[in-house]
């Protein structure tokens, strides 16, 4: 079969279905990969010939990451190296898994993709439950060699705590602001102007105290 409505189902590899879009498809307002994802593809392959101009690599990288995030999928982008940059990118649900160096005549880019994670994330989204356009797609059964290999991907034991100090501080500040805003709205809604907190000396009660202080300051309430 030939067309833009093909989903390739690898029956011998669990949760592995892929679809293909070509080059500029990714850059248009409504990329075909969005329909592919809604039709069940969890890996998108893009065979590209992207020309190189100053600043385009960063834009391309963000575009691939964002498309993989929107569609909760893995996105594999490969660009020719003949007269272009040869920029290869693998992104999974908004996260960069691997990318090649540009302007190299010969390179292979590979990375580990967590298909089970993608399937789990999609189960949380009602968007992927019912899609009337699925009937326009044709499922093509394929088989790939499925051999045991070592995991090459680094798995962070603390995935929600950034290793970079600046990013970690920014993340903590964001969490504090979210909790502060939530408490502030609740105090405004109930008309409450005082709070009683049991301080044990542990982290939880300390955080509760800090959030309460910030919320009271934001509302210009007396801390006492």
Model-derived segments and spans:
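Beta-strand-turn-beta hairpins that frame and shape the catalytic cleft
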Residues: 3-20
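Active-site-proximal beta-strand elements of phosphoester/diester hydrolases
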Residues: 15-25, 45, 179
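CN hydrolase (nitrilase-like) catalytic-core segments centered on the catalytic cysteine
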Residues: 24-109
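ATP-dependent adenylation/nucleotidyltransferase module used to activate substrates
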Residues: 25, 142-143, 169-224
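Composition- and surface-driven signal marking solvent-exposed, interaction-prone regions
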Residues: 33-35, 57-59, 100-103, 125, ...
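Active-site-adjacent bridging/hinge elements
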Residues: 42-44, 150-159, 179, 187
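C-terminal beta-strand edge segments of enzyme domains
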Residues: 71-72, 76-168
């Amino acid at each position: 079969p030939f067309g833009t409505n093909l989903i390739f189902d690898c029956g011998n590899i669990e949760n592995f279905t892929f679809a293909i879009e070509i080059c500029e498809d990714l850059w248009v307002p409504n990329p075909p990969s969005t329909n592919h994802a809604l039709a069940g593809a969890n890996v998108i392959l893009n065979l590209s010939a992207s020309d190189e101009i100053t600043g385009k690599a960063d834009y391309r990288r963000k575009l691939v990451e964002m498309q993989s995030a929107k569609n909760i999928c893995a996105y594999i982008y490969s660009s020719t190296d003949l007269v272009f940059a040869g920029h290869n990118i693998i992104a999974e649900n908004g996260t960069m898994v691997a990318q090649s160096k540009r302007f190299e005549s010969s390179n292979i880019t590979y990375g580990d993709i967590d298909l089970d994670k993608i399937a789990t994330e999609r189960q949380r989204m009602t968007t992927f439950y019912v899609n009337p356009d699925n009937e326009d797609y044709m499922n093509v059964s394929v088989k790939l060699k499925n051999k045991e290999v070592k995991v090459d991907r680094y798995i962070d034991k603390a995935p929600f705590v950034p290793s970079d100090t600046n990013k970690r501080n920014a993340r903590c500040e964001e969490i504090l602001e979210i909790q502060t805003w939530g408490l502030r709205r609740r105090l405004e809604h109930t008309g409450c102007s005082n709070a009683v907190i049991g301080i044990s000396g542990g982290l939880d009660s300390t955080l509760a105290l800090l959030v309460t202080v910030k919320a009271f300051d934001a509302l210009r309430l007396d801390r006492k």
